[in-house]
């Protein structure tokens, strides 16, 4: 795509080397749509940097990523729960749930393992059908 754009003199936004497509949300390619939709790009980037700082902590209960990974390991490997559901109760958060599903599937689904299957659901829509099945 980039070579086509260069050949036809179409401007493009840079994606830093080593940044996979699913993480480009934090690059100019991902930040431009946020800005065009009126989102607060600076607040978004500050939030990402803040989470990165938290995820560098070495104390388990101060590191949300390590804590989530630990909980998921226990639920999956020790308890046998093979599905990881992200179910926001806001329609506005539906795309975040789907993005999380993509991140988990693409990051952990590359090799045959016992990783949980990620699933996105919407609270009020799915709680009366899927949630009943999961809780049975």
PLM features: what roles do these ranges have?
Residues 1-136:
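Active-site phosphate/pyrophosphate-binding segments
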């Amino acid at each position: 795509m980039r070579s086509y754009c260069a050949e036809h003199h179409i401007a493009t936004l840079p994606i830093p080397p080593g940044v996979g497509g699913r993480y480009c949300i934090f690059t100019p390619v991902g930040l431009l749509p946020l800005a065009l939709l009126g989102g607060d790009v600076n607040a978004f980037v500050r939030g990402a940097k803040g989470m990165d700082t938290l995820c560098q902590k070495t104390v388990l209960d101060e590191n949300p990523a390590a804590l989530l990974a630990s909980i998921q390991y226990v639920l999956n490997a020790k308890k046998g729960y093979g599905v990881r559901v992200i179910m926001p109760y806001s329609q506005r958060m539906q795309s975040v749930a789907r993005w999380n599903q993509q991140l988990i599937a693409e990051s952990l689904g590359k090799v045959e393992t016992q990783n949980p299957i990620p699933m996105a659901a919407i609270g009020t829509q799915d709680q009366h059908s899927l949630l009943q099945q999961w809780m049975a």
